[in-house]
Amino acid sequence: MLLRNRFLLLLALAGLLAFLSLSLQFFSRWLPVSLQLKTEMQVFPEFPVRLIQVGQGREEGLGAKNRKRIMPEPLTEPPALNPLYEANLYCNTPGAKERSMEGHAPPNLKLLSVQVIIRHGDRYPLYTIPKTKRPDIDCVLEPGRKPSHPHLTDFISHMSKGVDTQMDGTLGSLPRLPNHILCEMGELTQTGVVQHLRNGQLLKEIYLKKHRLLTSAWTAKHLYFESTGKSRTLQSGLALLYSLLPNFDWKKINVKHQWSTIFCSNHCDCPMRNHYLEEEQRRQYNFRVKNSLLEKTYINMAKIVGIPTRQLRASNPIDSLLCNFCHNATFPCTKNGCIDLEHFKVIKTHQLEDEKERYEKQLYFKYALMATHPLLNQTANRMLRIAEGKKDELFALYSAHDVTLSPILSALGLREARFPRFAARLVFELWHDPEKANNHYVRVLYNGEDVTFQTSFCRDQLRSSKRPLCPLKKFSTFVQKDMFSSLNSTSYYDACHQRLF
């Protein structure tokens, strides 16, 4: 009798769960799209989900059903190439608390400096697909809208107070907050701001609270902040800085303007760098035209949109579609049909395969060595100065782009590193052994993962040693010598101006 009652109870619970599941999946289909997205995103606020549309509805009452199913993001990396998994990682949607290895070193070592290179956070597309409706994304910051952050309200308030700050060049004329109801092209979104508020909070817990890199008496000389001239990079850097140093004194902030996306400053004259970039672009073109499935996909998408295939390709549709994907917005529809998830998967898969071939051909690697040497040289020289006892620029922040970070990863020899996601961060730490005056070490971390021993300059270092750290000398030698030997040169100038024959 007892077993029978337990069976009936379990049966009733199963029925209730089934009813709730169906309600969660299908009740919101009668709501407006904007409310659908908000409802669905709040089902499990602490558990990131990706809403994949099963039947694409057409715009303007064309009558197709608009159902979605909930797919939990995988907790472990799938064994084979998975474009949706990779796209999820690229979106970097704020979710569960992130684990990181920043600041982890033997307890007897002292942290001397940290240099961080970031990619801006989530942004509105740089390109639109012709004859389609732009993604309906609001770039006005609203703390009550998800994703949000405990510091967001105070951050918004603090950004309106900085009349005394010093900003080079055109940076002073840029808005410090995204502020358009319908985002402008390339504008930072609220998601992008939150991503860097989270980055700053994480770095604060590690570097300020645990290692006391900057004390409460820090001054302008202890901080270095450089940004390109785009509002999305300036705003991303300010968001990270605010969470790192809440309610910072604007008088202590001096933002340097970098006109080049590769941060080459006064060393941008490099003909051979341009040559290898052109060769790499030629490789990309040849690889694309060999992909018959990709071409068929573009042809099909062009028919749906009603434009020539060449015009569709030129609009770089993956940029716009990634915005839809990352924000759980439906893909564009016209009277001829809808761009769907299969189109997206084909283009994203091609991107991933192109990255693999890029590594094999090594043209991009040669470009990367020359493109990144000025910035890596600045990074190494700052470490060497601090190792000698200087106390300036203990925390350096470069707010940049994917085209900044990607060649740095390549130049460092990080073969397994993924293409920089939104709000990606690359960190260089300098450590010192107080018991041995000349013992300085460097750690390299990418999105919280310790990749020091994946770099070409420290791959041969024994990780099983008592001190699993890479000597600073190895990094400085790499920058000052080894980068050029890979190019059959002895200096940056020679590498940039050598003849091909």
From Swiss-Prot:
A Pfam family of the record is His_Phos_2
Q: What is the catalytic activity of this protein?
A: 3-O-[beta-D-GlcA-(1->3)-beta-D-Gal-(1->3)-beta-D-Gal-(1->4)-beta-D-2-O-P-Xyl]-L-seryl-[protein] + H2O = 3-O-(beta-D-GlcA-(1->3)-beta-D-Gal-(1->3)-beta-D-Gal-(1->4)-beta-D-Xyl)-L-seryl-[protein] + phosphate
The protein's topology relative to the membrane is: Single-pass type II membrane protein
* Biological process terms in GO annotation: chondroitin sulfate proteoglycan biosynthetic process; glycosaminoglycan biosynthetic process; positive regulation of heparan sulfate proteoglycan biosynthetic process
- PANTHER family associated with the record: 2-PHOSPHOXYLOSE PHOSPHATASE 1 (PTHR11567:SF110), ACID PHOSPHATASE-RELATED (PTHR11567)
Membrane spanning segments where?
7-27
* SUPFAM superfamilies, A to Z: Phosphoglycerate mutase-like
The residue spans the entry assigns to the Lumenal side of the membrane are as follows 28-501
What task does this protein carry out? Answer: Responsible for the 2-O-dephosphorylation of xylose in the glycosaminoglycan-protein linkage region of proteoglycans thereby regulating the amount of mature glycosaminoglycan (GAG) chains. Sulfated glycosaminoglycans (GAGs), including heparan sulfate and chondroitin sulfate, are synthesized on the so-called common GAG-protein linkage region (GlcUAbeta1-3Galbeta1-3Galbeta1-4Xylbeta1-O-Ser) of core proteins, which is formed by the stepwise addition of monosaccharide residues by the respective specific glycosyltransferases.
What name has this protein been given in UniProt? 2-phosphoxylose phosphatase 1
What InterPro entries does the database record attribute to this sequence? Acid_Pase_AS, His_Pase_clade-2, His_PPase_superfam, Histidine_acid_phosphatase
User: Taking the first listed entry, what is the main subcellular location of this protein, grouped into a coarse class?
Assistant: Golgi
- Could you tell me which CDD domains the record lists for this protein? HP_HAP_like
E.C. numbers: 3.1.3.-
- Cytoplasmic topological segments: 1-6
The family this protein is said to belong to: Belongs to the histidine acid phosphatase family.
Q: Where in the cell is it found?
A: Golgi apparatus membrane
Give GO terms: molecular function aspect only.
phosphatase activity
Please name the catalytic residues of this protein. H120, D402
Task: Give the record's GO CC terms.
Answer: Golgi apparatus; Golgi membrane
